[in-house]
Amino acid sequence: MTTLTGYKSTILTLCLLSAWVLGHAQENEKPCLPVRDIPPSQMAFQAGEKLTIIASYQWGVVNTDVGTVSLDISRSDSSDVPLFIARGRIQTARFFNAFFRVDDYYESRFYRTNLRPTYFMRDIHEGKYTIQNYYNYNQDHTINARIIRKDGSVQDTLLPGRICTFDFITLFYFLRNLEFSNMNPGDVYPISFAIDEEIFELYLRYDGKDEIRVQGLGTFRCLKFSAQTVAGVVFDGKEDLRFWISDDKNRVPLFIESPVVVGRVTGRLGSYENLRFPLTSKIK
């Protein structure tokens, strides 16, 4: 069974992953999450959108912001096929750098029509741990992956992807464009993404509509989702990760929470720019 045990994530990396994708790892083949061409008028985001998620750690009386996750998206017209380019940056707050410094960079290029990835890279610096991933996605859905580790060793491998196998930056934008009107509470959706030299097969559950207050932004109508975390060095595998996205056409992540082995991690939307649609989910 494939698990995330031993995967060297930090609180900030987990907040980015947790925004959409952590769940139960399984061995058997799963049905694919539907991949479809999305009419431009229905796209949940636009070039120029910028989101900042504030990551926090809670344990007993300790409740502190530890860093930020920043995401922005632009368009590329330099290739024969129009693409989106999404970039992510994860950084610890200055005071936290003395304990454990994180400075991670992600970049993904994907089709503007169906949001399928063509290229992905990540450059990870977490304490003394560093790693780089470079992926090129092929027409047959396999992935040419190059993994470069701290000692300079290079691993080239071919990953057996499927049409619904994403990198987790592209997955973030793809999932915002699901056909939410067809969802019912309790519906479960398969998710597949690549990281390092592995493919992870996970599940996402829709839990229905809710309201949530986001510090500094207000109260919003939202859609609530959950996923079962995988037991390992950070999660205990006993409780669900939960997250809330805006119940409007933008589908932006508002709040994320998950128990960890010691304490709890959360991520809340801190700021946003250039949303495609009015944020009509805001109540007050």
Model-flagged regions — what are they?
Residues 21-25:
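Sec/Tat signal peptide C-region and signal peptidase I cleavage site
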Residues 11-19:
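Bacterial N-terminal signal peptides
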Residues 139-195:
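Active-site/ligand-binding surface loops and adjacent short beta/alpha elements
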Residues 1-11:
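Bacterial N-terminal signal peptides that target proteins for export
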